Amino acid sequence: MDQIRQLAQWIKEANTIAVLTGAGMSTESGIPDFRSENGLYAQEDNVEYYLSEYYYKKDPVDFWRRFKRMFSLKMMGGFAPNDGHRFLRWLEEMGKTVTILTQNIDGLHTKAGSTNVIELHGTLQTATCPSCGNKYDLSFINRHEVPRCEKCQTIVKPDVVLFGGLVPRMEEAFAAAAASDLLLAMGTSLEVAPVNQIPFYVAAESPATRKVLINKTATRMDGMFDLVIYGGIGKTVASVRKQIQAE
């Protein structure tokens, strides 16, 4: 059985599907990733320093200047979900219980209509005042070079997990992954902890859960998966959907 037919069969057999997505999920929407030759790490110096909790506290004015520049494309909005995002919504329409565990901060899974999305690294869509808790949307953030709380004038903080910060919903993600019949990892290099521990956790806690990786390139964790498909997400899921519909 070829890989596409195998994955289609496993999806049909699964009732509960957990999907771990990374930056490669959104590149087909025109959003750059972090680690490719054209990604953020190649375009900017010291990314992990300037996007850290430490630097936000040290120099919040320069932090925002750099943050807005690094994420200018995302901050402008206008990006649309791609075939990969829509495929996950389609799985829900098939009657599957789908939980998306995303490392992305672009909000495209929700835009595509997925109903159960755990944004592990937060979202670009909002920022919060660390002093009084007031929350502000993207239009407010973009109107101000350095966004300050209207109530107390504190410089607000983006609702993304900065380097050195805690990932607040990890326990929920581990539980959802272990409770699934099928774990799909899509468009992720599996380089970032603690998210990259999810396949290990599933293997230990739920050995019957099938684990599948779809990615353009090999990762250091390929050996953790029952099935690895190398290729673009859009093309791969189109083939899988066609196979499911044909059977």
From Swiss-Prot:
SUPFAM superfamilies registered for this protein in UniProt: DHS-like NAD/FAD-binding domain (SSF52467)
Name the NCBIfam families on file: PRK00481.1-4
- Supply the gene name: cobB2
Q: Any idea which GO molecular function terms this record carries?
A: histone deacetylase activity, NAD-dependent; NAD+ binding; zinc ion binding
Per the record, GO CC terms?
Answer: cytoplasm
Similarity field = Belongs to the sirtuin family. Class U subfamily.
Q: Which cofactor does it need?
A: Zn(2+)
Q: What keywords is this UniProt entry annotated with? A: Cytoplasm, Metal-binding, NAD, Transferase, Zinc
According to the UniProt entry, what is the EC number of this protein? Answer: 2.3.1.286
Alphabetized InterPro entries for the sequence: DHS-like_NAD/FAD-binding_dom, NAD-dep_sirtuin_deacylases, Sirtuin, Sirtuin_cat_small_dom_sf, Sirtuin_class_U, Ssirtuin_cat_dom
Q: Which PANTHER family match?
A: NAD-DEPENDENT PROTEIN DEACYLASE, NAD-DEPENDENT PROTEIN DEACYLASE SIRTUIN-5, MITOCHONDRIAL-RELATED
Which enzyme class?
transferase
Task: List ligand-binding residues for NAD(+).
Answer: A23, T27, F34, R35, Q103, I105, D106, H121, T188, S189, N215, I233
Q: Which residues bind nicotinamide?
A: F34, I105, D106
- Subcellular location, in the record's words? Cytoplasm
Q: How is the cofactor bound?
A: Binds 1 zinc ion per subunit.
What residues form the catalytic site here? H121 (proton acceptor)
Gene3D superfamilies associated with the record: SIR2/SIRT2 'Small Domain, TPP-binding domain
Taxonomic superkingdom: Bacteria
Q: Which species is this UniProt entry from?
A: Geobacillus kaustophilus (strain HTA426)
Q: What is this protein called?
A: NAD-dependent protein deacetylase 2
